[in-house]
Amino acid sequence: MIKENVYFDGNVKSLGFSQQDGESTVGVMAPGQYTFGTGAPERMTVVKGALTIKRVTDADWVTFTAGEAFEVAGNSSFDLQVEVATAYLCEFLPA
């Protein structure tokens, strides 16, 4: 089953799906600044565009571009700065 997710007044949209190796979402973020909370640990891969992020454990902002990935701990949060419309894959990791 495919689940549609809409955040931040429609500026972030994703489609959630399940496979044998777990849950994932694929989506697009419009330019803007966002803060996301996590339940499970996540791996975010930038498909096209760029995400500049700051996790709770980061001292500075870090930019990831197409083909690059980062992980965020479960029960945490991270801030995002998005300069151009960006596509991403989010994989939920085992706790």
Curated annotation (Swiss-Prot):
Indicate whether Transferase appears among the record's keywords. Answer: yes
EC number(s) recorded for this UniProt protein:
2.4.2.1, 2.4.2.2
Tagged with keyword Transferase: yes
Q: Which GO cellular component terms are attached? A: cytosol
| Alphabetized InterPro entries for the sequence | Ppnp (IPR009664), RmlC-like_jellyroll (IPR014710), RmlC_Cupin_sf (IPR011051)
**Reactions this protein catalyses:** a purine D-ribonucleoside + phosphate = a purine nucleobase + alpha-D-ribose 1-phosphate; adenosine + phosphate = alpha-D-ribose 1-phosphate + adenine; cytidine + phosphate = cytosine + alpha-D-ribose 1-phosphate; guanosine + phosphate = alpha-D-ribose 1-phosphate + guanine
Superkingdom of the organism of origin:
Bacteria
The protein's UniProt keywords, in alphabetical order, are: Glycosyltransferase, Transferase
User: Sorted alphabetically, which Pfam families does this protein's record hold?
Assistant: Ppnp
One GO MF term attached to the UniProt entry: guanosine phosphorylase activity
Q: What does this protein do?
A: Catalyzes the phosphorolysis of diverse nucleosides, yielding D-ribose 1-phosphate and the respective free bases. Can use uridine, adenosine, guanosine, cytidine, thymidine, inosine and xanthosine as substrates. Also catalyzes the reverse reactions.
- What is stated as this protein's family in its record? Belongs to the nucleoside phosphorylase PpnP family.
According to UniProt, the name of this protein is Pyrimidine/purine nucleoside phosphorylase
User: What species was this sequence derived from?
Assistant: Vibrio cholerae serotype O1 (strain ATCC 39315 / El Tor Inaba N16961)
| Lineage, top ranks | Bacteria, Pseudomonadati, Pseudomonadota, Gammaproteobacteria, Vibrionales
